Amino acid sequence: MTVKVEKEIAGRTLTIETGRVARQANGATMVRYGDTQVFTAVTSSSARFGMNFFPLTVDYREKTTAAGKFPGGFIKREGRPTTKEILTCRLIDRPIRPMFPDSYTKNPAVADTSVAAMVLSVDQENDPDVLAGISASAALSVSDLPFLGPLGTVRIGLIEEEIIVFPTHEQLKESKLDLVVAGTMDAVTMVECGAKEVSEEKMVEAIAKAHEVIREIVEMQNELAEKVGKPKMELEDLPDNSEQKAELKVKYFEGFREKLLTEGKHARSSAVSEYISACQDEVSPEPEEGAEADASLPDRDLVKSLLRDLADESERELILSGTRTDGRSYTDIRDINAEVGVLPNRVHGSSLFTRGETQSLVSVALGTGKDQQIVDGLGEEYKERFTLHYNFPAFSVGESWPNRGPKRREIGHGMLAQRALANVMPTEEDFPYTVRIISDIMESNGSSSMASVCGGALGLMDAGVNIRQPVAGIAMGLVKDGDKTAILSDILGSEDHNGDMDFKVAGTQFGITALQMDIKITGVSQELLAEALEQARGGRIHILKEMLKALGKPRDDISPFAPRIIQIRIDPEKIGLIIGPGGKMIKSIQEETGTTIEIENDGVVTIWSTDMEGAKGAQQKIEALTEEVQADRIYDGKVVSIKDFGCFVEVLPGQEGLVHVSELADGFVDKVGDLVSIGDIIKVMCLGTDNQGRIKLSKKAAEGGGDGDGDSKPPPKERSREGGGDRRGGR
């Protein structure tokens, strides 16, 4: 039985439907907005023992048939996920993952759970990513899987200070804000955005508006679940270890406080681990080799797990008491060291940004238009001229794992940093280079994506990229227990792990350029969000000041090893002259000058070269090719062909005109070949063009003989009849 709920939101109808397809899944829904439609199914397999994490998999795929297209490339079938698909997977995963109860995710026998979303139709106006988030929540809500939702997801734009709900693609091009918010009926749980220096106050207002719409979407899902929702599966309660935990807390809790205050990430981690092992051995000694475990003693693995929980709780209590593990106050920023030009200038720009025990080594490359990334998705194909790639190697945290390409986390962090910097990049007209940033995390103890933003901004300035404003980023945290609340600036890795919120903010001194927030608790009030944003602004300004000590503004010139560029504009109708037949002319210019030449349809010609002299040489050749032949001007031209009625002379590269026999000399000319030969360089004057635009030339006018009007004519009996006389004109 097909059941649907509908509601008009922002002038279009949002429809959530279930019961038509994928009836063997635990839950499945179709969500439609305009003509964009997304399907999502959720399933759960048999439980597995021994898992120490929640095996949730989110998969989002965009089928090109949804846009009436074929996949690009040789193989006409969807392959590995695109960057957009990976980012959307994260957009779905992040808000729903905390919404599964502990009795499901921490059960000794935890089940593999998958969320599979597919785009079935796209109207080129409404992005399917937010609809996939709604569809995933709705599918979980009508399924028998335990879920603490529903969740709503909405996109918000900002045009001329007006907040736009579910903006279209065209509206987003004008918008200062691309904000995606997810939340429950009571609170916001996830925020993701790129912005053009939007103020903190406007950001809070936009998030508040998003939450109003989220409530409407949640109501729709509740209505659907009431109609056709399956009874939720019964779960066994988690073992009650509260008494054992309380005993351990009385005995060992204060010891954790001392160990947590150890200076240094690895020293602190080792001190806590050694303390846990010592406590474990004291409570439940490991049996000697070959001996059986004492059944009267607590289970060693359970004791270790409870002690780890106590270590986490101890850090939270320590923070709420006003002390952080590294001794900082809530608003203190770790020591910052920023350097630029740390790599040889073969690298077009570089920086090393260190904040505490987090370090980003940034390298920047400047390229030509050929280096732009072609993006072929469901919409029109386009090119990206700015990219940032983030790498998180194992050595950055002192560990070892195989490097098999970027993981979803690396792609997500890289895109967050890219958004933060993209909105201060110069326009293509002002800086026509393609720009690539690589951020290699050399050390990590929290906030590595924001270190990439800071290092990236410095690297761009070192490369001579005239960004509008320098950008800094900061990661904020939250620890909340009842009425006690601690908002933390520049969080450590352990504060991220044990806290209730991970809140990253990047921006200039004037406003926010990127924001990402994930909340592990049921939600955060708008007042608390506003307070966190304001505290983040103070930290951001402090970091900017420290960064600018290394380099106050973009360098005046680019690296000598970066490609040089000259841009000129020509008449679009003359593009063919530069290209030549079969590309012969442009290839010749490029080979002779050692340049790369790109021509846009609007007549903008871009000349690239590592040698400025070569670029100038190519410019001169192009300008000569496209120069207009001017009437009454004398040219040194080359005779390229001889006819009975005159000769054709090349006066500018690729531009020929006719010197009629009557314009070769005073008096009667019997044979053209008697006066000129092919290859001769002769002076000619341009007499203008005929009614077909063909160039008319005169040799005798250039030499001062005659008036250029063709006053010398042969006797009628010797008049040539071949070739149609002067009606042939020039070419």
Language-model features: where?
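Alpha/propeptide regions of enzymes that mature by internal proteolysis
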Residues: T2, I9-R12, N26, F53, ...
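Mobile "lid/hinge" segments at catalytic clefts and subdomain interfaces of large enzymes
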Residues: D144-E263, L460-D556
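Long, charged amphipathic helices and adjacent flexible linkers at domain junctions
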Residues: V228-P231, L235-S242, H542-I568, G614-D636
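Single-stranded RNA-binding regions, centering on S1/OB-family and related RNA-binding modules
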Residues: F561-P563, P572-R731
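Extended amphipathic alpha-helical scaffolds
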Residues: M1-S44, G50, M233-E380, P563-L577, ...
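Conserved phosphate/anionic-ligand binding catalytic regions in large, soluble enzymes, centered on
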Residues: G27-T29, N126-D144, E339-V364, N445-V465, ...
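Glycine-rich, flexible beta-strand/loop modules in the N-terminal catalytic cores of phosphate-handling
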Residues: A25-T113, V119-N126, M185, E192, ...
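Flexible, glycine/charged-enriched surface loops at secondary-structure junctions
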Residues: D102-T113, L148-P150, I217-L235, H266, ...
